[in-house]
Each structure stands twice: as C-alpha cells, then as structure tokens.
Regions:
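C-terminal domain-boundary segment and adjacent tail
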Residues: 36-44, 196-276
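Alpha-helical scaffolding within the catalytic cores
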Residues: 30-31, 53-64, 157-167
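A general structural detector for well-ordered alpha-helical segments in enzyme core domains, enriched
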Residues: 29-33, 59, 63, 91, ...
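Short glycine-enriched, charge-decorated loop/helix-capping segments at active-site entrances
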Residues: 20-24, 85-86, 234-241
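N-terminal regions that are enriched for targeting/export leaders
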Residues: 1-35
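Metal-dependent polysaccharide deacetylase catalytic core of the NodB/CE4 family, i.e.
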Residues: 3-4, 16, 40-121, 130-131, ...
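Active-site-adjacent pocket scaffolds in enzyme catalytic domains
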Residues: 105-214
Length: 276
C-alpha cells in the first residue's frame, strides 16, 4: 500500500525557549518554502502561533490564497499539558478566535507547542469542535524544569486514531489524532526538514521505507529554513545542524519521495479514515 506524506509546518518564532522573539525563519524562510511548494506542486498544512498571525498579515494572506491547510499552534510556545484544564480551554479558545479573524475558513486542526498534549487537551479540542489533532509524537517524553513530567508519548499509537472515548458521538464529530512521525534516525525526534539538513535527503528517503506506518507527518519549522548560524551562533550545535538557508536538499527530497509515496494533507487523511 502506498505511503502518504503530509508536510506540516509549525509557523512559530525561532528556537522557542532559547531565542526571544526571533522571526527570521518566518520572515525569510516561509516565503521561500511557499515558492518551493508551489514549484513542486506539494500541499502543506500550516499551524500558526497566534502572535505570528497578528504580526504578519501579508504572510497569512499569501498562505490562505495558496489554499494550504490552516491549523492552530496555540497562543504561545509554552507547554499546554502542564496547565489546569480551565486555562488550557481559555487559551485554545483565544487562539482559535485569532485564527478565525485572520482566515476565511474556521481552524479545525491543532498542534500543541512542543507536542505538549494530554487527554484533557484532547477532550477540550473535541468539545470545541476541532476535527484533527497532530500533537502526539510517539517515542517522545518531556519534563518541565527537567524534573516534573510534562507528557509521555513513548507508548502512543503511531497511526491515526480516535484518542478520546466516543461517548455518544458519531465518528464524524470525533477528534482524530494524526501523530507526528518519529524519526528513525534519531528516536524521540520528529521526521522532518531538520533531519534532511542534518543527515542528507537520501538518508531521509531511506528512513521513509523504515517507517512502518502508512501515514507520515513530516514536520517543518521556520528556523530550519534559514542559515541560523548567522543569526543565532549561541544556539546549541545540534539544533544549528538542522538548519539551512539552501532548500536544494529539500527540493531533491520532495522529488525522490514522490517516487515512493504520495503527498497528502491532514484533512484528506481524516476523510480517508472516515471512509469518505
């Protein structure tokens, strides 16, 4: 069965938690990414942090006109799963309203900052009418302040699934979890552009074959699209190695991947999951 690759972009500030207010990736990298996607005819889903939406209306308009998918990436990049339910719900509501005011379509996809979701988060999303969550990264866990558990996705299912008990809901009103794909070259990390920049596109194409699941969510961050060393030399080398202002390797990956998989979007995956 042919594998499906969903290119998924977290539109956020540069190196959250390490750099304060960096926007180089959004301002320089995302426009280049849009040109590349148009050139190779690959669709993508863009998950927006609220501050980016309000600060860059021209970019918002360009992505909307290109008819890429639009998702919510939260108010900021603080962990959501460590907050009380009432706070989680209010933050999701506020970020939803910001996207509703900026885009012609209502946002129905969500990705928590830093993959920080739990069952409470997922229940809130379902209650608020979200159709898709793509926050869970199987194989990953995180601690707050290196001590307090924030989330643990190590045993999470790797294929699309309903994460919240059904109750009396019909399938078409339930939240579908479409997990981010774990990178077989670096367990616990996401498969995405950072891996191409760090290991080369050929190794990432090989990694696609190593992944057992049929649906792959391929993650892109804005700061991976720029020469981050020139702007943020104090960022750890492991993160800088995942960045490049030359999208040539990404272009070659997209071409090579098309020979072994098809490109899709998260809404299309949901439609297929529901039998539509």
């Amino acid at each position: 069965m042919t594998k499906r690759i969903c290119v998924s972009v977290d539109v956020e500030e540069d190196f959250p938690g390490l750099v304060k207010g960096g926007r180089r990736g959004v301002e320089e990298g995302i426009p280049e990414l849009l040109r590349l996607l148009e050139d190779v005819h690959v669709p993508a889903d863009f998950f927006f942090q609220s501050s980016i939406v309000t600060e860059h209306p021209d970019l918002v308009s360009r992505i909307a006109k290109a008819k890429h998918g639009i998702g919510n990436h939260g108010l900021n990049h603080a962990f959501l799963s460590t907050k009380p339910p009432a706070v989680q719900k209010e933050e999701i509501r506020r970020s939803t309203r910001i996207l509703e005011n900026a885009f012609p379509q209502e946002p129905r996809m969500f990705r928590a900052a830093g993959f920080s979701t739990n069952l409470v988060t997922l229940e809130i999303l379902q209650d608020l009418g979200y159709a898709i969550d793509s926050s869970i990264l199987p194989g990953r866990r995180a601690k707050r302040f290196r001590v307090l558990p924030a989330y643990d996705h190590r045993a999470a299912p790797r294929d699309p699934h309903f994460p919240v008990p059904s109750g009396d809901r019909s399938a078409d009103t339930r939240l579908l979890e479409i997990p981010v794909t774990e990178n077989p070259l670096r367990r616990g990390g996401p498969l995405g552009l950072g891996a191409i920049n760090a290991y080369g596109f050929d190794k990432v194409v090989t990694a696609i074959h190593a992944v057992e699941e049929r649906t792959l969510v391929f993650l892109v961050h804005p700061w991976e699209l720029i020469d981050a060393r020139a702007y943020y030399p104090k960022v750890p080398e492991g993160l800088l190695a995942a960045c490049s202002g030359d999208l040539g390797a990404f272009r070659e990956f997209l071409k090579a991947a098309r020979a072994v998989a098809e490109f899709s979007t998260l809404p299309n995956v949901r439609r297929g999951f529901l039998g539509g």
